Amino acid sequence: RGAKMITQKIKPNVAIVTDVCHDTSTPMINKKTEGHTEIGKGPVISYAPAVQNNLRERIIETAEKNKIPFQRLASSRFTGTDTDAFAYSNGGVASALISLPLRYMHTTVEMVHRDDVENVIKLIYETVNSLKNNESFSYFDSWFNIARLIFLINPGPS
């Protein structure tokens, strides 16, 4: 609920959400339903309905440019994180999810890899630095500009 409130109060242009995901090499985790992610192999970039494609691609380009290792994970209808709240409130905030792979989630012996923690921080830092002032990731801005261009090329009957 906090993420939805934030969108109303500060009206962000972009939301890069961080959370954790399962290290699926952990015993009793089903790779068929959870995907394949492991600690020590980098942050996990999510593909999901709430994740804005243009922003996600910027994050991937940033990781590749800065040689930050990363993994990919597909989510179904919901990510189960604040990404959903940002994406579907206040007219839709361009949102992305970068997760930290975690072994033994919700136990007293949770484990992460130090390199993954550092790479999550680097990836967010470099991505934020790549953003331009008032840059829009909105699908609507792109389609609106294309529609305007089409109209200018072919304004219809005179």
Name these PLM-found stretches:
Residues L152-P157:
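Short, intrinsically disordered C-terminal tails of secreted or membrane-associated proteins
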Residues G35-I121, T127-W143, A147:
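Active-site-adjacent substrate-binding region
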Residues R1-G42, T83, E135, Y139:
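Acidic/histidine-rich catalytic neighborhood of metal-dependent amide-processing enzymes
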